[in-house]
A protein has these predicted regions:
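His/acidic/aromatic-lined binding-pocket segments of jelly-roll/cupin-type domains
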Residues: 111, 137, 143-146, 192-193, ...
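Ligand-binding loop in jelly-roll beta-barrel domains
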Residues: 114-119, 127, 150-154, 207-226, ...
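Acidic/His-leaning functional-site neighborhoods
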Residues: 270-344
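Loop-centered beta-sheet repeat module
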Residues: 181-234
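Intrinsically disordered, low-complexity linker/loop segments enriched in Gly/Pro
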Residues: 149-202
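Transition-metal
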Residues: 1-168, 233-274, 296-298, 372
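Non-heme Fe(II)/2-oxoglutarate
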Residues: 73-74, 213-247, 276, 311, ...
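Short acidic-glycine-tyrosine-enriched beta hairpin
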Residues: 189-202, 327-350
């Protein structure tokens, strides 16, 4: 919530409030949706009400979907977060990012909960040239899965094509399954990658993928809204009792068949590189792949670590620990306390800041920004 103190005239306009929000870290109002594959991790950890089904998605870092709360003292106003993007794109994004994306927010954090649930649909996202020519979008949905948690006997992510797969054989098997024939043998054609908590799996567009059951994923991705082409939905129907759509023609045109078993393990699974190690903690780069325009860094500290800007808006999530605090190095904004699994945005105009653990316990924060 953005607190808006009164001016000397004892009033603050809506535009003034957006201007204030563009210069300090803020959280948006999250919302949660059920899905056929949904689980129960978010219900337990976020103390959500029983909805009679499950919780599959959480949108906590998506300005296109979320809202802001503006506290004027005598009243609280809820407003679309996109209004901030439209009103103050340079302050929010930074000049460099604004020059590339205009009034579009390029980073998305959302959550996928399959804990005690089911696999997501097997899917692929369109290549840049495909989404431009077919859907007139500027850029595509490159993404990644950061594992907040994993449980059960063999949690996994399906990722890339198994070495030796013949494209025509896989497409024929998918078409047969779509026509009501033999179910698609996913593990014959797609790599099944074992995962654990804090693994980071990178998913550039064109890579076949889905998260498996018993995982809790923080999805870090680019945001051209939602373009997901489904190959296989495990023979199930949606919550409304109807089959979900399959997009085999789009899929066949976008699957990158060279991303086989060896390539996936070499390029897309836990490509962690040390950035900084000192007495106050560590910083590692966890992604994303060079084909993607986002960088992600994990800060681990029991004390305080500085965060320097690279000309880009930052999006953060506390992936381990009870709470962390973001503080301005120049007192440019009031401290923001971030709780476990919460997401926040730090505008470029907020300047340099620090991540600290208020009680001395270890915290881990994942940070995403647009790469230089």
């Amino acid at each position: 919530m953005i607190s808006v103190p009164p001016t000397s005239r004892h009033r603050y306009t809506y535009r003034d409030a957006l201007s204030k929000a563009a210069a300090q870290p803020f959280r948006m109002v999250p919302y949660f949706d059920p899905g056929v594959w949904g689980g129960d991790w978010m219900k337990t950890h976020f103390d959500l009400p029983d909805n009679g089904s499950n919780y599959a998605w959480s949108f906590d870092g998506v300005p296109e979907e979320n809202s802001l709360l503006l506290d004027f003292g005598s009243c609280v106003v809820e407003t679309p977060a996109l209004n901030l993007v439209y009103a103050h794109p340079r302050e929010l994004l930074g000049d460099r990012v604004h020059a590339r994306f205009g009034k579009e927010f390029p980073i998305r954090f959302d959550m996928l909960d399959t804990m005690h649930g089911q696999n997501l649909s097997l899917q692929v996202h369109p290549l840049t040239e495909y989404i431009q020519s077919h859907f007139h979008m500027h850029y595509t949905q490159d993404e990644s899965y950061y594992l907040l948690d994993a449980a059960g006997e063999a949690p996994c992510v399906y990722l890339g094509i198994k070495t030796g797969t013949k494209p025509e054989e896989m497409i024929d098997a998918l078409q047969t399954a779509q026509n009501g024939g033999k179910p698609f043998p996913a593990e014959k054609f797609v790599n099944r990658i074992p995962v654990k908590k804090h693994d980071h799996v990178l998913i550039p567009a064109g890579t076949v993928h889905c998260s498996g059951a018993d995982t809790m994923v923080l999805e870090i991705s680019a945001t051209p809204y939602i373009f997901t082409f489904k190959l296989w939905d495990w023979g199930r129907v949606d919550l409304d009792g109807k089959p979900r759509p399959i997009h085999l023609e789009h899929c066949a045109a976008n699957i990158q068949w060279y991303r086989n078993t060896e390539w996936v393990h070499r390029n897309l699974v836990n490509t962690v590189a040390e950035v900084y190690t000192g007495e106050n903690g560590t910083v590692v780069r966890t992604g994303l792949h060079e084909l993607e325009f986002l960088d992600t860094f994990r800060f681990t500290t029991s004390s305080t670590l500085p965060v320097h800007r690279n000309g880009s808006v930052h999006m953060l999530n506390l992936v381990d620990g009870t709470r962390a605090v973001l503080r301005s190095k120049s007192d440019a904004f009031p401290p923001l306390e971030l709780h476990y699994a919460e997401t926040c945005i730090v505008p470029q105009a907020a300047g340099d800041y620090e991540i600290s653990s208020p009680d001395g316990s270890e915290v881990k924060v994942i940070l995403a920004c647009v790469r230089n």
